Amino acid sequence: MTDVQETQKGALKEIQAFIRSRTSYDVLPTSFRLIVFDVTLFVKTSLSLLTLNNIVSAPLWDSEANKFAGLLTMADFVNVIKYYYQSSSFPEAIAEIDKFRLLGLREVERKIGAIPPETIYVHPMHSLMDACLAMSKSRARRIPLIDVDGETGSEMIVSVLTQYRILKFISMNCKETAMLRVPLNQMTIGTWSNLATASMETKVYDVIKMLAEKNISAVPIVNSEGTLLNVYESVDVMHLIQDGDYSNLDLSVGEALLKRPANFDGVHTCRATDRLDGIFDAIKHSRVHRLFVVDENLKLEGILSLADILNYIIYDKTTTPGVPEQTDNFESAV
């Protein structure tokens, strides 16, 4: 093992200790807004509310059972579109979507053979490591924080924790991230083969099928030579159908990208020789959802997701969940 590798190994242990010593609640900003949807809400209405509030997910609440009922994400809309787009009568399918309620989402997943997401959550005052491990085990990109009233036993939705917020919290509070200097191509991290890609001419619906079948949140857009041009994300689908115009799904990716909002976070790239210290610095200063690994000619070589980074950080023999220490000397990830 080289000195750089030895240093990185020691840094990982320090970062893991930091994660175990903090709670999920510590990651939350001082003030924030939480939007919760009742499961009786129409899918069409929920889509409009997500767009209006510029959010991509929301906790679900079953008011009849008085308990947390899961998390609404872009994957749910992708599954609904795939299910109804396969209908023999497209006009009837569109009319049915308009009458569809959130409580029917699990039935849609069953019919298209999609794996239903686990209704997982963690207590906000438990170790942040518990949240990281739960997200990794379920392959979730975010996890709800649920408290329970000690007297009534009623569940209370506190917030939703995302991979990005956790990694930004680490980047802001762990100086050890500057010691992660092993190049990506010398680490077991990321996806480097069998990449799902599309071209500017690919129909949006074909990209939606990729998103649903591969359980991914984005598809890189490349040209005939494999050069990275753009990315089509599941959130782009939300903006495309927000007005109820499902005919937009027949557009090409190139046409659909012209309808993308101006606040798009951009396409983040890196090289195979880049290191996690620089990537954590990027996460600290920019809203990064994933990084596309490219060569000097921008030819796509691999994809590094936030899940890849978080899993690399937490998976070690020292990742046993611990009892958080009570410390206030850190910054929340706003």
Curated annotation (Swiss-Prot):
It is found in: Nucleus; Cytoplasm. GO terms for biological process: cellular response to glucose starvation; induction of conjugation with cellular fusion; positive regulation of gluconeogenesis; regulation of carbon utilization; regulation of glycolytic process; regulation of transcription by RNA polymerase II; signal transduction. InterPro entries: AMPK_gamma/SDS23_families, CBS_dom, CBS_dom_sf. Residues 29-89, 115-177, 187-247, 262-319 form the CBS domain. ATP binds at R141, T191, A196, S217, A218, R290, I303, L304, S305, L306, A307, D308. Gene3D superfamilies: CBS-domain. GO terms for cellular component: cytoplasm; cytosol; nucleotide-activated protein kinase complex; nucleus. ADP 2 binds at R141, T191, A196, S217, A218, S305, L306, A307, D308. AMP binds at R141, T191, A196, S217, A218, S305, L306, A307, D308. ADP 1 binds at I35, R142, T162, Q163, Y164, R165, R287, V288, H289. Pfam families: CBS (PF00571). It comes from the Eukaryota. GO terms for molecular function: ADP binding; AMP binding; ATP binding; protein kinase activator activity; protein kinase binding; protein kinase regulator activity. SUPFAM superfamilies: CBS-domain pair. Keywords: ATP-binding, Carbohydrate metabolism, CBS domain, Cytoplasm, Nucleotide-binding, Nucleus, Repeat, Transcription, Transcription regulation. The 4 CBS domains mediate binding to nucleotides. Of the 4 potential nucleotide-binding sites, 2 are occupied, designated as sites 2 (or A), and 3 (or B) based on the CBS modules that provide the acidic residue for coordination with the 2'- and 3'-hydroxyl groups of the ribose of AMP. Site 3 can bind either AMP, ADP or ATP (AMP, ADP or ATP 2). Site 2 binds specifically ADP (ADP 1) and is likely to be responsible for protection of a conserved threonine in the activation loop of the alpha catalytic subunit through conformational changes induced by binding of ADP. Adenine nucleotides-binding subunit gamma of AMP-activated protein kinase (AMPK), an energy sensor protein kinase that plays a key role in regulating cellular energy metabolism. In response to reduction of intracellular ATP levels, AMPK activates energy-producing pathways and inhibits energy-consuming processes: inhibits protein, carbohydrate and lipid biosynthesis, as well as cell growth and proliferation. AMPK acts via direct phosphorylation of metabolic enzymes, and by longer-term effects via phosphorylation of transcription regulators. Belongs to the 5'-AMP-activated protein kinase gamma subunit family. AMPK is a heterotrimer of an alpha catalytic subunit (ssp2), a beta (amk2) and a gamma non-catalytic subunits (cbs2). Forms a dimer of trimers. PANTHER family: AMP-ACTIVATED PROTEIN KINASE, GAMMA REGULATORY SUBUNIT, LD22662P. This is 5'-AMP-activated protein kinase subunit gamma.
